[in-house]
């Protein structure tokens, strides 16, 4: 049985970044501001995990825990990487986690 969640209960959201060419080199002047911005989101208990993709380094994935996708969307809109043109596009997807200690909806067999 899958337990359904009521509105207002935190869920997981993935923020996907598609980066510009030569992203690793071009991010250097903005990295400190981006990391500080991410740490502030962690302190607010919105951002759970984040990091660049590798092989190739052409984007990043950020995991949020929030009541709505707005936390991830607002993060992207003000992220120094986005504001400085390092991210070609971004998108937020709800991630319905079902297995694991931090899963929001647990499957019981």
Predicted features, each with a name:
Residues 2-109:
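Conserved, structured core segments of small domains
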């Amino acid at each position: 049985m899958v337990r359904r969640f009521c509105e207002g209960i935190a869920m997981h959201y993935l923020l996907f970044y598609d980066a510009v060419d030569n992203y690793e080199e071009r991010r250097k002047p903005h990295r400190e501001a981006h990391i500080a911005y991410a740490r502030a989101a962690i302190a607010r208990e919105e951002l759970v995990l984040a990091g660049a993709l590798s092989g190739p380094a052409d984007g990043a994935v950020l995991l949020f825990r929030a009541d709505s996708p707005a936390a991830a969307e607002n993060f992207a809109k003000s992220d120094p990487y986005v504001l400085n043109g390092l991210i070609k596009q971004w998108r937020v997807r709800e991630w319905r986690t079902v297995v694991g200690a931090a899963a929001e909806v647990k499957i019981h067999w």
